[in-house]
Amino acid sequence: EMAKPSRKLGFTHASRKGPMIVCLDTSASMYGTPERISSTLIALLEETAEELERDCFLIDFSVSTRAIDLMEKRKAQRLRKLGLTISEEHPSTTHLPFIGGGTSAKKMMKQMFELLDNDGLHYVNADVLWITDFLIPDPPQSMLARFKEYRDTGTRFYGIRIVRDDDKEPNTWKNYFNQIYTIKYRPLRRY
């Protein structure tokens, strides 16, 4: 009688726990309730990234951009709790700054592409999340083509769209993302 093998060989996808790049819209249209929602999301993302041991880089944008390595910020906070100090380029804040003004994705996308291209910063195979209302003017076609190129080569792009519950604006960005989730809110009434 022939012995039956006790195991089967199979193919299983490796779980991807690479870095994350989070692009946060801090334009005037995100003021108020959307700002509070996005601040909460960023705090949850920070905790989740730490639990999953995933590096996380934040780019907040409106007309200008500001980049923050969230994991470095967390490490600095832990060191301060131990009584150790390190010099910081940006002062630590407990909440995200509100920049205000208009919205332009050009600078943010350039910074995002630089992170995705730079092997030394280990964000090459990052997942990208945009937190915005997606009321963003289209950047030049060359940038959109590059966006699509990254997506076609395995970079996953996700969006969280924060809009009023009566929002009827079509989202022109949806074809560039793997998935866009929507959070609807009802504005508070002032009596």
Kindly label every feature range from the protein language model.
Residues 1-20:
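Negatively charged sequence features
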Residues 15-126, 128-131, 135-139, 160-171:
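Von Willebrand factor
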Residues 33-35, 139-142:
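Conserved ATPase-coupling elements of RecA-like P-loop NTPase cores
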Residues 45, 145-152:
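Catalytic-core regions built around general acid/base machinery
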Residues 52-54, 124, 153-157:
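Loop/turn elements at helix/coil->beta-strand transitions in domains of secreted/extracellular proteins
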Residues 76, 82, 167-191:
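Von Willebrand factor A/integrin I-like adhesion domains
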Residues 142-146, 172:
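A short acidic, amphipathic alpha-helical/loop segment
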